[in-house]
Amino acid sequence: MTQMTVEQFAHDLGMLPNLLLEQLQAAGVAKRSAADFVTEQDKTQLLDYLRKSHGSSGSRTKITLARRQTTEIKQSDSAGRPRTIEVKVRKKRVLTTKQDESDAAGKRAAEDVSLRTAEAPEAPEAVPVKSVLDAEQIALRAEEARKRSELMARQAAELKEKQEKRRQQVTAQTEVKKESTQVQEPGSETAAVSGSVAATQPESTETAAVTPSATITVTTQTTPAAKERAPQKPAVKPEEKGEKKKKQARQQEAWKDEPVKRRESKARGDVSGGQEWRMRKDKHGRSRSDESQSQHAFSAPTEPVVHEVLIPETISVAVLAQKMAVKAAEVIKVLMKMGNMVTINQMLDQDTAMIVVEEMGHVAKIAAPDNPEAFLEEVDLSPDEARMESRAPVVTVMGHVDHGKTSLLDYIRRTRVAGGEAGGITQHIGAYHVKTSRGVVTFLDTPGHEAFTAMRARGAKITDIVILVVAADDGVMPQTIEAVHHAKAASIPIVVAVNKMDKPEANLERIKQELVNHGVVPEDWGGDAMFIGVSAKTGQGIDELLEAVLLQAEVLELKAVRDAPAKGVIIESRLDKGRGPVATVLVQSGTLRRGDVVLTGAVFGKIRAMLDERGKSVSEAGTSIPVEIQGLSEVAAAGEVFIALSDERKAREIALFRQGKFRDVRLDKLHVAKMEDVFGHQEDISTLNLIIKADVQGSCEALAYALKKLETDEVKINIVHSGVGAIIESDINLALASKAVVIGFNCRADLGARKLIASTGVDVRYYNIIYEAVDEVKKALSGMMTPDRKEKILGLVDIREIYRISKVGVVAGCYVLEGLIRRDAPVRVLRDGVVIHSGSLDSLKRFKDDVKEVKSGFECGLSLKNFNDIQQGDQIEVYEIVETARVL
C-alpha cells in the first residue's frame, strides 16, 4: 500500500493542506508540515475526532450555559458619603440539542459569556476555541441566527398589547399609592423619602419620570403596601443604632427594590429592565431614567408597513406577493375569498391585482412599463392636410354565394378569374386595381360562402365603397343581409348591383322591395343607395356601375399622404414553399418600397420582393394599391395593420415584446380545471381531433369556423393544430400522437410526409372546396354520435298451460296471439298488465322440435331463463331493439 502525504490527502478531500494540518493537530495527530506521511491509524483517529465534533451518530448532548452579569449601584449613606455596591447575577441554563447544533450553540454561548464578562474586571477571560468549521457551515449557522432574530422580532410585536396594558396598570397603581400613603400621625417622627414609580413603554426607550410632587411619606410601621414593595430581605443592614430618623432613612434605602434582585419577566421581548418598579435617583434625590439600560432595546414597529405597488398589465401571483413583501399563500387566501382558485404561477390581470393590493392594505398604482411600442408614437403618422392628395377608392364586392360577384369583376378586368376558382366559388380575398378613363379603382372580391364571415368583415373594414351584388332571379339571401350589416356597421355607402338582368325572370322592383326591409333604400324612393341593373354575361350596365362608384368616391373626397412611411392592412397571408411567408397587403397611406422594414403584430421583416396582382415585380406601391410582399419572419395574421419603419432593430424589439405579451395573454386564458368541472365531466362525449392545413390563412380560419359550428352536446371538434403551407412530417407526427385526422385544404403533403403517412396509416383528407370538407366532417360526427334506440313489438303470447319437469323446470304451453315469437328476442312477462320480469327465452319448441320462431295462430312450448314463477293466464310480450343512425 502506497503512503500518502498530508498534501495529497488534503487534495483528495478537496480542502486546504493548512486546514487539514490544524484538524490533525486538534485530533492529537502530530504532523508538522504538508510533506509528512499520513497512516491509516492517523486517518481513523482524525475520523473519530470529527465524528465526535460534528455528531454523526445523531445522539443528543447537553449544553450548559453559564452567564454572569456584574453591575454596580452607587448609593450614599446616612452621612452623605457615596458608596458603591457590586451586584453579581449568575444564570445557569441547560439545553438538550442535536450534536450538529451543539457547536453553534456552544460557540454563541462562549461568545456571549466573553462579551458579558469582559466588562467586569474580576471576570476571567474566555479562552478562544479553535474552529474546524468551513465557510459553508458558518454561513448556515449565520442564517439560523438571522431567522432566530426575526422570530424574536415577531414575538416582540405580539407582546405589544400586553405590555401596554401592564404599563397602564402600573400607572393606575401609582396614582392609588399617591392618595393612600399620604397619611401621617401627629407627633410621630417620620422620614420623607422621595420615591417615584415609572413605567417604560415597549415601543420606545423613553421613560416616564415621576414629578417631584409625587413624594410618598412612609411611616416607621410596616404597611401592607410596603410589604408588597419589599418581597426580599434587605441587602444592607443598618450599622448604627442612633437616631430614629437616620435609622428609618437607612432602612428605606436598604429595602429598595433593585433590578438585579428581582426575578426576570417570563415574557420574551420585554426590554424595560424592571424600570417600572423604581426610578433611579441622583445624589439630590431627584428621579431620573436610566437611558443606558434601554438604548439597545428592540423597538417593535407601531404601524404596519404600507408598500406602494406598481401593477403592470399582467402579473403573476408570486411576483405580486414579492412586491408586497408577503408570502404567496396570503395573496392566494385573499383571491380565494374573492372566489378565484389560483396558483402562484397564474397570471392576474391589472384590475384583479389592484383589488388584491388594496384588500391587503397597500397602495396600488398602474405601472408605466418600458414599452418599446412608445417608439411608434414618436413616428409622425398624423396626416398633413397640406401634403394630402386624392387617392383611388377601395371598393369591396360583397353578396351571396353564386350571385355573380367574381363574374362581374371578370368582365370589368376582362379576365377569367371565376373559371379558375375551385367549384366556381371564391375562397380568398382577391385584390385588383383597374384603370378606367376616369381614374383607378381598387376592387376587393370577398367570398360569399357563409363560412367566410371573417373575410367579409375584414373586407368591410378596409373599404371605402361596397358594391352589393344581388341576383335578380334569386333575391335577397342570408349572406346578402350579412353584407348589409357589415357595411352599415362600418358606415360605408352601398351601391347595389342587381346582376343577371339578362334572364327573363329578373325583377328589379322585387329586389328593391326586399332590400328596403333591411334598411337599403334606393335613391328614387328617397334613399341614398344607388341601384344599377347589370349583367356580367352581356356587359349590360357595367359602365353605369363604374360611373356610380366614381361618383360616390368624389362625394367622399378620399385623400391620403403619398410621401410618408407606408401604412396599410394585411388582406391575406400564406406560406409558399419556395418563397416563404407571403402577404397580400393594401397600402392605405404613404408609399411602400422594396427594402422597407415592415412591422405587423408580432411579425416583422424586410421586403425582399414585391409583386402586383398580375405577378409582375414592382419597386413601390402607392396608396390604395394592393401588392404581394415577401420577406416576413413568419405568416402574418390577416386583418392586422402593418407599418413601415426605418429602424430594423427597433422593429425586431417591438415584435419580440409583442410575442412575450401574447404569451402572457395565452397563459392567462389557459383553462384551470375546477372541481365542478371534474365532477361534471361527461364520459359519453365524443371528440374528433383535427389538424387543418390550408393554402392561405383566411381559408384556414374559415374552415375552422365552419367545422366548429358542427359541434353538439354529444360530439365535439378539437382543432389540435391549424396552419398554412404544405403538410409536413411534424404534422403527421402530431396527428399520430393525438389520433387526429389531417385535412389539407388546397395543399398537399410533401415527400417526407407521404412516406410517413404510408408507414403509419394516418388518415389524411384533401379538399379544394369548403362544401366537401364540411360535409365529410359532418358525416364523421354523425357516425360518432350514439344511435337512437327504439323498441319494436314483435308479438304477444298467451300462456295456456304450465308443466313442471324435474330436469328442465317450468315449461309453459303457449298460444301466439299476435305477430310472432323469436328464439333470440328479448321478452317481458306481463301479469294483469304489469311487467313482472324482463329477460330472454331459454328454449322454444313446437312438437318436441326446437324452432327459431313461431308465428301467429300456432301453439308452442317455451321456458324462460332464470325465471320459473310463471302462472296460467300470464302473457309474454316479444320485442326487439332497433337502432337508428342520427344525423347532424
From Swiss-Prot:
Superkingdom, taxonomy of origin: Bacteria
Record carries keyword Isomerase: no
Biased composition (Basic and acidic residues): 98-114, 158-167, 226-243, 253-269
Biased segments, Low complexity type: 207-225
Residue ranges of the region described as G1: 399-406
Residue numbers spanned by region Disordered: 96-122, 158-302
Chain residue ranges for the region called G5: 535-537
Region feature (G3): 445-448
UniProt entry keywords in alphabetical sequence: Cytoplasm, GTP-binding, Initiation factor, Nucleotide-binding, Protein biosynthesis
Main location group: cytoplasm
Region (G2): 424-428
Residues annotated for GTP binding in this entry: 399-406, 445-449, 499-502
GO molecular function, one term: translation initiation factor activity
Domain annotation tr-type G: ranges: 390-559
GO CC terms, sorted: cytosol
Span of the signal peptide: none
UniProt keyword Protein biosynthesis present: yes
SUPFAM superfamilies: Initiation factor IF2/eIF5b, domain 3, P-loop containing nucleoside triphosphate hydrolases, Putative DNA-binding domain, Translation proteins
G4, as annotated region: 499-502
Residue stretches of biased makeup (Polar residues): 181-206
Compartments where found: Cytoplasm
Family per similarity comment: Belongs to the TRAFAC class translation factor GTPase superfamily. Classic translation factor GTPase family. IF-2 subfamily.
Function in brief: One of the essential components for the initiation of protein synthesis. Protects formylmethionyl-tRNA from spontaneous hydrolysis and promotes its binding to the 30S ribosomal subunits. Also involved in the hydrolysis of GTP during the formation of the 70S ribosomal complex.
Designated name of the protein: Translation initiation factor IF-2
Lineage: Bacteria, Pseudomonadati, Pseudomonadota, Betaproteobacteria, Nitrosomonadales
Gene: infB
